[in-house]
Amino acid sequence: MAPALTQSLNGATPQVKAALHHLDANTVSIDDIIHYLKHHGGVVVQNLISEEILQEVGADIKPYFDALVEPGFFSSKTRIVTRLPNKSIAFVEKIFGNQVFQDICDHFLTSHHRGWYGNEQYTYSPHPVFNSALAFSTLPGNETQSLHRECMGQHNKLPAIAPEDYPIGRDTVLGMFVADTRTTRENGATRFIPGSHLQSTLDPPDESQTVPVEMNRGDVFLMLGSCYHGASANVSQAEERILYSTFMTQSTRRQLTTCLFLVQEENIYLSVPVDRVRVFSPRMQKRLGFSASDPLFGWVDVKDPRKVFNLPGLSEGQHIDV
């Protein structure tokens, strides 16, 4: 059932009585997840990532935590690993490529457009592509991260709406946070404002509305990019919190919002060499962005990148001869 709405004092911004729900991966359907995302903005899916996959990905990534990256936007007690596709095939194929995550991203981020080429009409439906990926290790003493919307870098300006009016195309990015360790309020769990994806993007965050995204190892948190969120302080005595995050973005722009910049947040084309791209499955090569978007955006020498680099498989937009 959709959450009830009340008007704020200025009569402009709906205040959504939303919540953070936990669903079991063994019983939940894709339609269930879509419903919770539309109405609440985020949802925890328990037991989505197996122990075997976490061990494989951890063996690839965790050694890099010792090679510290300058924290930048993050606390000095936060260690981050970047360029994950260049460090872990398993991360790309089994976490970023998780079928539930990909199906959810397809639903919210796939564009649909019709256009004419001469006397023939075509329908274009380019799928979303990789936006970013990071691994986080937060240590005791880690500071609170400011609340923010993931889509702010794409200048995604949105009006307030009711949950039943949520249109596909409103969000430009969608993310998944994977718990490698138990994640609690005390050791730095993500703070999340349920329903904030329905607010105007001009509204500031209200810390009093946050809830901690507490998870066990193997659980994931799926979140629309217009939701306010941010890491909590790690006030535990000795607990390290390890989290993998990855986001996908629309590969083209629909005019449902006044988004001005739609580029991938992480420049994967400089961080992942072509020889590394060849190692991935054709499906993941496309999802990482090494493929033309339907009908033929992202070409090299007016050809699909797959042909230029002799990558296997066909792209989505090869039906128009340019």
UniProtKB/Swiss-Prot annotation:
Q: Which GO terms describe its biological process?
A: biosynthetic process
Residues reported in the UniProt entry to bind Fe cation: H148, H229
Q: In which pathway does it act?
A: Secondary metabolite biosynthesis
- What InterPro entries is this protein classified in? Phytyl_CoA_dOase-like
Task: List GO molecular-function terms, semicolon-separated.
Answer: dioxygenase activity; metal ion binding
Q: EC no.?
A: 1.14.11.-
Keywords for the protein's UniProt record, in alphabetical order: Dioxygenase, Iron, Metal-binding, Oxidoreductase
* Annotated SUPFAM superfamilies: Clavaminate synthase-like
List membrane-spanning regions. Answer: none
Superkingdom is Eukaryota
- The answer, when asked if Metal-binding is one of the entry's keywords, is yes
Q: Does the keyword Mitochondrion apply?
A: no
Q: Which cofactor does it need?
A: Fe cation
Oligomeric state and interaction partners are given as: Homodimer.
Q: What does this protein do?
A: Polyketide synthase-nonribosomal peptide synthetase; part of the him gene cluster that mediates the biosynthesis of himeic acid A, a ubiquitin-activating enzyme (E1) inhibitor. First, himA, together with the trans-enoyl reductase himH, catalyzes the formation of apolyketide chain, which is then condensed with leucine by the NRPS activity of himA. Dieckmann cyclization and release from himA gives a tetramic acid intermediate as the product of himA PKS-NRPS. HimG then catalyzes alpha-oxidation of the tetramic acid ring, with a subsequent rearrangement to yield apyrone intermediate.
Q: Which family does it belong to?
A: Belongs to the PhyH family.
Q: What is this protein called?
A: Dioxygenase himG
Corresponding gene? himG
